[in-house]
A protein has these predicted regions:
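Domain-edge interaction signal
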Residues: 2-173
Length: 173
């Protein structure tokens, strides 16, 4: 089991590359969707907001929207330095969200993440990251690894509950 955990921390998830202008446009549209539909008014100065945005973008990939960011597993779950760079440099414009909504399963994504805490997003996104890195893990093995990774920060019962909720929302775990 320990060797698998080591692999997880060394693994870097590679996404399809996208030109920077298109990626920034999509990120702006995604932020607008989050603001209009989830009341998520991104504040760059809020650590919780930055963590939430990192997890929203990562989780959206499981619902069909890949914005082209590379992720590694960090203390708060999957983290993309490229995404951080983009949101620090983002000039929010009034982008059309209709086309973006059509590119992925927005309604299921919205149901899955609406009203969720930073803790919920962190644990569920970490589970997705571990599964993506180790697709052959059974759910029990995945849960065991998740508890080892997040067990110092969160209660085992909460981790199990969030893991099962994520499965019920259609996360590919």
């Amino acid at each position: 089991m320990k060797t698998r955990i080591k692999k997880i921390y060394k693994h870097k998830v590679i996404h399809n590359s996208m030109d920077n202008k298109g990626r920034l446009s999509d990120l702006s549209s995604f932020l607008k969707l989050l603001k209009e539909n989830l009341n998520f008014d991104f504040n760059i100065n809020s650590l919780d907001d930055r963590i939430k945005l990192q997890k929203y973008v990562f989780i959206a990939k499981s619902f069909g929207l890949d914005l082209g960011y590379n992720y590694s597993l960090y203390i708060y779950g999957p983290y993309s330095p490229g995404l951080a760079k983009d949101y620090y440099n983002l000039n929010l414009k009034d982008y059309n969200t209709t086309q973006l909504e059509k590119r992925f399963n927005w309604s299921n994504f919205k149901l899955a993440v609406q009203g969720k805490s930073v803790k919920w997003l962190e644990i569920s996104a970490t589970a997705l990251s571990v599964k993506e890195t180790n697709p052959d893990l059974s759910r029990d093995e995945l849960l065991d690894i998740l508890i080892k990774i997040k067990g110092e920060a969160y209660d085992k019962k909460d981790i199990k509950e969030i893991f099962n909720e994520a499965i019920n929302y259609g996360f590919p775990l």
